[in-house]
């Protein structure tokens, strides 16, 4: 298995499902073992919230904004994510900002919209590969008909949903997150004896990392419907795969089914 990232599905630019492949070793140098055919699903959101400063605005400070990476249901992502680096516009002092603990967020003031590149690092027993995301900071409100008046009370919210899938995870990672309310695990073998929950790198030093009581949480978008859409899509794909597998088995047992043409269109 190559170290790579695969886009499994993409409803639009703001909704993606990604599979991150790790190094194909069932056991690493630390003795950690992978669980074959198991997948861990972690829904994350990257976004920004910007408030217009109104009368307090100056030429180069018109908005106060916060950019962040959070759990889709505001649960703690510190069990999965170790560090997030936000790459701001080069006009900012120290444009490369490192956040080493949840909540993974930073706030600034400015006047212009720009693309923020985001690098997500996972704990060593989660994945060896970093995840590169990008987010366009939005300051000016608009709707389907175009720009609308600015308000100091209602912020501009821009968020995107990413469901990250980790195949063949380490046992220690699964043990740490198998009771996590926002993380799903598929195909856990019956009778699997998990080791004690792994202490992920510096996770034990981190403070409470959920964003349920974050000051900006009232403005966070809800993604429960998106999660259901991905679940339905995954279920449909599994059914289709099972049907295709059954058809192949029938062909092997009984030969080509009557009325079914060969895929090439030619007689064999």
UniProtKB/Swiss-Prot annotation:
Main location: cytoplasm
Domain annotation YEATS: ranges: 34-180
Phenotype upon loss of function: No visible phenotype, due to the redundancy with TAF14B. Decreased FLC expression leading to earlier transition from vegetative to reproductive phase. Taf14 and taf14b double mutants show a pleiotropic phenotype that includes small size and abnormal leaf morphology. Taf14 and taf14b double mutants flower significantly earlier than single mutants under both long days and short days conditions.
InterPro entries per the UniProt record, alphabetical: YEAST_sf, YEATS, YEATS_dom
Record GO biological process: cell differentiation; flower development; regulation of DNA-templated transcription; regulation of flower development; regulation of photoperiodism, flowering; regulation of timing of transition from vegetative to reproductive phase
Keyword Transport assigned: no
Regions annotated as coiled coil: 227-252
Places the protein is found: Cytoplasm; Nucleus
Signal peptide: none
GO cellular component, one term: NuA4 histone acetyltransferase complex
Pfam families given in the database record: YEATS
Record's keyword terms, sorted: Activator, Coiled coil, Cytoplasm, Developmental protein, Differentiation, Flowering, Nucleus, Transcription, Transcription regulation
Tissue: Expressed in roots, leaves, inflorescence and flowering tissues.
Stated role: Negative regulator of flowering controlling the H4K5 acetylation levels in the FLC and FT chromatin. Positively regulates FLC expression. Component of the transcription factor IID (TFIID) complex that is essential for mediating regulation of RNA polymerase transcription. Component of the SWR1 complex which mediates the ATP-dependent exchange of histone H2A for the H2A variant HZT1 leading to transcriptional regulation of selected genes by chromatin remodeling.
Complex formation: Component of the TFIID complex. TFIID is composed of TATA binding protein (TBP) and a number of TBP-associated factors (TAFs) whose MWs range from 14-217 kDa. Component of the SWR1 chromatin-remodeling complex. Interacts with TAF4B, TAF5, TAF8, TAF12, TAF12B, TAF13 and TAF15B. Interacts with the transcription activator complex FRI-C. Interacts with SWC6, FRI and (via C-terminus) with FLX, SUF4, FRIL1 and FES1. Interacts with EAF1A and EAF1B (via HSA domain).
Family indicated by similarity: Belongs to the YAF9 family.
This protein's name: Transcription initiation factor TFIID subunit 14
